[in-house]
Amino acid sequence: QHQISFPFKRYQIQAVWRADRPQRGRYREFYQCDADVVGSGSLVFEAELMEMYDRVFKILRIPVKIQLNHRAILESFAMHLQRPDLFIPITTALDKLDKTSTDEVAQDLEKVGLTTSEASWILAQIQNKKLDDFHFHENSTKGVKDLQTVFDLLRHSGLNNEVIFEPTLARGL
């Protein structure tokens, strides 16, 4: 009677606070919507969440591109280079690419311990936005297959906004 049934879906909209010092134009307190599905590994729920985001932005009349990535693809950069210990620093550096230059990200990658050639290899990989070209490690191949499944599920769903693969997206890790 008092047990949660799975998969469990939830969402909430509430005030949240930044722990760090807010940058210019940002507030310490702001509203955020979180949506989660727990208790299932089915990719159907990933597609369902993409459909939900699409509906919300349609209702708000805000055209967007919904970006999608897979943790296994991000992990594969470090694993391919045999540097699994640098997964988080590599991912953090890549996630800055929408805000800073490629040269600065290359410097950040070298600061965390990658060689110039290793940093260059990663940056060359992410220039390619075609999902089929990310089969350079068994981990990335799993991520590619999972994302292809999600894109296949979304193909006939009538989305209003475009869902795209973005290999540098790493928010929330």
Task: State what each model feature region is.
Residues 68-80, 169-173:
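Beta-rich nucleic-acid/ligand-interaction surfaces
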Residues 49, 70-73, 90-93, 105, ...:
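Internal, well-ordered alpha-helical segments in soluble enzyme and binding-protein domains
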Residues 50-52, 79, 86:
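Detector for methionine-enriched segments
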Residues 41-45, 67, 96-99:
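Short C-terminal domain-edge/linker segments immediately following a structured domain
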Residues 82-111, 159:
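Acidic, His- and aromatic-enriched active-site or binding-groove loops in soluble protein domains
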Residues 1-63, 105-173:
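Positively charged, Gly/Ser-enriched RNA/tRNA-binding surfaces
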